[in-house]
Amino acid sequence: MAMQIRPSLGGCLRHGGAGDHAARRLSRLRAAKVFVPTAVVCVLLCCAPWVMAEITNDAEREPVYILNAMYSTEAYTNEDAKALWTGMDMAFYNSHYKAAGGRPIKILHPDPDQDNLYDIAEVILHSLARQEKLLAVLGPYLDGRLTAALSNADVVQSGLMLIAPFTGSSGVRTWSDSVYFTRAEPMVELKVVLMHIVNRLRARRVAFMRLTGMHFGGEELTYVQDTLTSLLRDPAVLYTVPYSESSVEVDEEAFDAMADTNPQVIIVWAAPVQQVIYFLEKVLTDPRTSSAYVISCSMIQRVVFDVYKRLLSAGSIKPQDGRILASATTSPVSGEGLKYMEVLKAQMSNYIENSGSFDYYPDDDSTETLGRKARSEAPLSRKYTVDEFFQAHPSIAKLMALGWLSGTLVQQTLEQTDWIVNRSTYKAGLFNQNRFVIGGDYVLGDYGGPCEPLAQFLGASCYCNQGGHSSILTVLQNASWDIVPDSSFKYPQSECNSSKSQIVKAVSVLALLNQGYPKLIDAGMQLNEVLPHAFDDNLCKGYKVSSIFLRVETAKAQQLFDAEVSNYSVDIIAGPIFQALDVGEIFVLNPLYNHPQLRTEKRNYVYLMPTLEQQIYVMYSKIDALRTRTDVFEDTAVVLRGYSAQEVVEISEILFKTAGTFNLPDPSVATISFTDSLRGLLSPRAINVVIGMKDGDSAHFANFLAKYTDVMVVVCFDELTMYYEELRATFSVQPTSVQARLMSFSSLPLWTDASAEAKARWPILGHFHKIFPDPINHTPSLLRDVIIAGFIQELVSTTTVAETKLLTNAVYINGGVTTYGFTLGNFEWGCTATTSGDSCVYKNYGASNIEILSIQRMLDPTVPQLSSPSTPTMEYRPRQRSHALTPAQRNGLIAGCVVGAVVLIATCTLLLYCCMDNRNNDAAPKDGDEPVTLLFTDIESSTALWAALPQLMSDAIAAHHRVIRQLVKKYGCYEVKTIGDSFMIACRSAHSAVSLACEIQTKLLKHDWGTEALDRAYREFELARVDTLDDYEPPTARLSEEEYAALWCGLRVRVGIHTGLTDIRYDEVTKGYDYYGDTSNMAARTEAVANGGQVVATEAAWWALSNDERAGIAHTAMGPQGLRGVPFAVEMFQLNAVPGRRHAALRTEIEAILPDDTATDTASSAAGALLSSVETMSDPAAGIAFVLASCFAPYPVAQRVRELQPLLSKWGVGAPPRSRLVSEEDYCQGLMNRLAIRIATVSQARLRLTREDAADGKFKLASSEALNPLAREGDSAAGGVRPRLPGSPVTSLPAGGSSSMREWRVFTRLMNDTQHPSVTHLSQQRPSNLTSFTEAQDAAFPLNAHCGPESRVENSGADDEEIVIVRVSRNPHYARHAFE
């Protein structure tokens, strides 16, 4: 019996019930040898019955032998094994080491002197040899030892039970009647981890760490990858290295490959070995992974805790509460409200106080460091309390709790008298359909052995040797483990393992909370709360809803949204949203805006409630029913509040089109800003439709309706839901005559109707009232949100995976969706082939049976309906002509109109004849042989300013015109024309033009605009561009108030100047002069690339000044710049009219032809019209563009773009991707213009070549030494042309160096001596794709059939246009004109 008193490997004394008593008994026997004879005599003198009874009692109390195999041979896991054994011993101690019938429990421990501790099979067999009546084995510890034990035939044949082994891999969790697992399988822990990653964290980038060559992580990794793949997620990035006892450092190459993906979650699934410790240290300290969630299994929870606490104490990391998690099969020891935990605490307290075997003391190092918890040699006076120990050592305490649960189960089995007779009866008892309840609320089982199929069918547990059926997730907070709320996973008690139970996946529903709109915030928060309550998981194929919200501001909405969807999974966007937000292909369900908007015609946008178009259609179709309540006329007065100019146009078009469909008068439309009041805008004799409510409107409606008894007010459904509480509170105290004349629309059952008839007709209404029984919550917004939840629930049940694209597809595949008897749809999107051609339907809205109802009916459901609900057809017809007039009336009306028209025409003709010659043309340059300096101006972001500040822009534009016209007169220049807010001005001298341009800037700066709103608007525009353009630095938005006031004020005007010969023509219609040709084009395009407040002059205008004039002008040389349609770089000079002003880089070629106000999603037509007026396109090109537009007009815009692609490819015209800020219509027209220019250019070139070849009879080949008009002097051909990107520095030409424009002028002067051109074709490429001009030369092809065999076409780096230029030989004899 010596092995009962040897020290254990874990650092504790060998102890255990009968072992200590046996040692004391052995000493007494040695001392009693002298008394043997006396004892024999005493026995003989006793009676025989007493002797027989004593012998029987001793036999009944024969010890029950249990082997403790819960030990570790590695120093870094000694603490774990020790803690597990301490928990087990705690259970035995509190049962006084007694089995059934009072038999003592004797714990046997391995003998290090006799046993090879590394060979678990040898340890078991040696112990069995020493004690043949050994009943069972506790353990072993770790997967490798369990596998080794089960692989030994002698161990298996011995009939010994291996009870409560501590393992962490699924590979060893197989059926065997020799092992009895008392913890849930590792796969259950993994499933709770995956549920948290997929549903709560929604992380897109997951990493998985495992060590190969161990019984650990293989099956778990396969499950993780399969699950992520089935959910259409990216597979986990791996860190896998072979297990090694010597090479324990981190594999840097493997770690870098993982860390460079910036994982959001790292799953660590390995045994507690040294490699894991080093890996965790690297993960927690590397900047690429330090912010990631680290999730581990319960087996290495203590190791993770130790590494984290050690690094935190050393200052290597900062606290990361909430980012370190671990799965578990039992609650943390800090958990409250659990009966079994209270029992554990009571037994642990008794064990600490009385056993003498608890060797953890408060004056030990409180940090849980491996191998440092052995008892001190000197006796310690104070002991831990249970709570102190739990707080100081949460991970060790949790392992003790696991050991205690297993020990308590073993204790319960040993208390069965008929089980512990021998090993066979013990095994039979263990597998006899057992379920164990510990502490009153912790359940293990059901365990069962082999059984008949019928028994299994009737509910028996068969071939089941494991009992845990649930797991939870714990999180490290303030150096303690807490339960993550709602993080449990469990599977049915009737199942032995979790293989048939999959994780519950969540549908991620995102609500955007716009911080600038409280009503949208309320709607988003309400939806966020309603969805989980209204979503029935049981009806959704293992799915639940995960409702999340994102707080955003308008300026940064796109940036925050893009970050959200790139890092986290989003399946549905529901409710509040921004109209300008680009959501890509994410499914948008029932979007809600700050005020009603027209339907977004995109496939991924789905509307469940009535759209604005549907409501307008229903109103006009039921206008007779509305008029039955009052004597109001059929006129409608519409107030649009808070809408942009473009939105007003679009909504007005729908209003007029719908009114015309029903032959009703067009409505009057009034527009006001969001802050304006309705006072004075509502008509006392019309149907008033208010679109765009704000707080306080309810009281205004009530007062207005009370004052005028023959009017009504109509509000839209979305605003009814947002302002319902205010409307209800205001109108509930009004007379019914007032209540009856406030109208709205709804496709919902009446939410306040709680009658049995209504609930029988509408099951959704009963479901709604069950969730919200309080009548105060019976609102349209809550009912809408319940329907949204039901729609998602039904939609998810029809899909294989709840992924955003599949959900969108499911809407149109199913057509209609019914939830609790409420049908939404029919949804349809696409075309079907018919005998008459394709029939296309694009219907992404599903509201039907739309009713016009009053607030009176909302408050009192017994009020009858105004009219029966209807589903609008949304078919529009042209207004029908009225035939109410008699023929005589019509004839009289026609005659009157004719006479009036004649008189009007005569009057207008006379006025024009008298007044047209009044234009003063004295200042106009009229000599076509003299150079003219043309100056173009334009206001930056004018359209955006009109949309934002319509009340201010009229006066601002008038002031702008006055300033410029005064200066034009002052400098003796000539106003050629104005288009919108743009001027074209002609000057005889370049100095007058330059002085005029500079003084325009200074005058506008000093002008008293009377408001700072214009400057605030420009700041907002620049800040908006920061969010949409990479590397954009706002030039003025971040200036201090003093700096800004000195440099900027009011409208910002850009000016472009160019000097040259022009074609001057007198216009008989306008009685003025106009200027045509390259000079006009160059000046207009120079203005187009400038920024607001900037004056840019070409080198032609600059060098037209005298030396003294140039010396007196502050300027900055900007270097050669590319202009649209100009086949060479043009030297530019910035005139510093206001010293200190800083401008953004010159606008790129594509910016110059796109709308000016891209930051605000508006478009400027003035600049485009001005460019067209100065022959941006040649006459042939314009004609070709007109033909193309006419040919493609019958197709929808998207189809036009597709049909244009082959033509663009054939003609070598590039098609840049469309920006989201450019409409499809503008984009399509731009492509047609490009194609027209190319066709006209090539056609004209061919015509010239044909004529010249006919005259000369030959074609001169290109010279390899031809000048490159796009390169500066001295540049080699290999250098190529590198277009300046936005923001890149500009440099001027070297002193004395001639620019390409001068080379071009010299080149054109040689035209009379030329015979044949050398043709070079510069095809379109993006700047980022440029390498060098040498590379471009490799892609050479002939321009046309007239080219000689040695002529070649080369690619250059033009940013946006494809141009054809002439390359000139250094031999003047071969110089020719360039053509485009």
Swiss-Prot record:
Q: Which residues bind Mg(2+)?
A: 938, 981
Q: What general EC class does the enzyme of this chain belong to?
A: lyase
Q: What is its main location?
A: membrane
Q: Which CDD domains match?
A: Nucleotidyl_cyc_III
Which parts of the sequence are annotated with region: Disordered?
A: 1270-1298
Q: Where in the cell is it found?
A: Membrane
Entry GO CC: membrane
Q: Which residues lie on this side of the membrane: Cytoplasmic?
A: 1-34, 913-1380
Q: Which residues are glycosylated?
A: 422, 478, 497, 567
Task: Enumerate the catalysed reactions.
Answer: ATP = 3',5'-cyclic AMP + diphosphate
Keyword Nucleotide-binding assigned to the entry: answer is yes
As for family, the record states: Belongs to the adenylyl cyclase class-3 family.
Q: Quote the protein name from its UniProt record.
A: Receptor-type adenylate cyclase A
Q: Which organism is it from?
A: Leishmania donovani
Tell me the organism's taxonomic lineage: Eukaryota, Discoba, Euglenozoa, Kinetoplastea, Metakinetoplastina
Gene that produces this protein: RAC-A
